[in-house]
């Protein structure tokens, strides 16, 4: 075993799995945002060349994997397993994307935390010796998510100021034993935190306590503090959730000066009218695999704490008046193996 258990939640990888290659695919709005130049491909329309939005999302996830394989000089046969998921019922974005690749597949659901969850699982599989190369990937699509979780698009419902825009995007990260980095040195499993928020148009407020809980676990278990990281990035808390998270830490006397959120990075909120920012599995996946890991390889950041969050709701639970459980999984990326 090339890993050490630090607590119930956190493990340290003694021989850190590294990023062999990664790729990000984005929709048209995402491509027009501040990070548009960092994506490997940008779709021309919401159907991504297919007949339905769901098929289009699956195509984006398949394209992300295909591009990552090409960039890494790999074939599908080189990958021992892939961990993938999305927001759709039965994970059809992932399953339909992967059905022609013939790679052993683990379906994962963590809502918008899925990129972090799949990375942690892929790194653990490699450290445990069951895989030499493993892929982690996910996707989301504005139109498919709106139809499943909210209302039909032709209805034209008014969006709340706290609402976030589900990103049309996908990302894939291929990890392996032989890599030039960045490396995943630690992974922290999140636990469900539910503070009773029932407003499904304010998921940032529902997820922020989970991010707070997981980040505290990271600092406690690894003996680090926020200043030990060049950048701390949550996934999709948006403007509302990010403010709540920084306030929770402020009340404990901790400043998150080097903190940002993928939902704030993906769009220009004012010019693109994105209200509280971006969300969706594909938001953090595209930002990580298109922008953050590229920045690490270029030397912009040496140590990065990536902590995507998820709102574990369903239309049924919301209609029944249930509150929204939140989850956050975290992984630590390091530019070199020496930072373990």
Task: Name what the model sees in each region.
Residues 19, 53-112, 228-243, 247:
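Conserved beta-ketoacyl condensing-enzyme motif
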Residues 30-32, 93-95, 145-150, 243-245, ...:
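Short acidic, glycine/serine/threonine-rich loops at helix termini
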Residues 57-73, 119-121, 206-221, 287-292:
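Short, well-ordered amphipathic alpha-helical segments that serve as non-catalytic structural scaffolds
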Residues 79, 130-131, 229, 301:
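Short, high-confidence coil segments that cap the C-terminus of an alpha-helix
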Residues 85-90, 112-113, 138-144, 190-192, ...:
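Acidic, glycine-rich active-site loops and adjacent beta-strand->loop/helix elements
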Residues 109-137, 175, 279-300:
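Active-site-proximal alpha-helical scaffold in enzymes
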Residues 233-253, 257-292:
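Internal helical hairpin/lid segments
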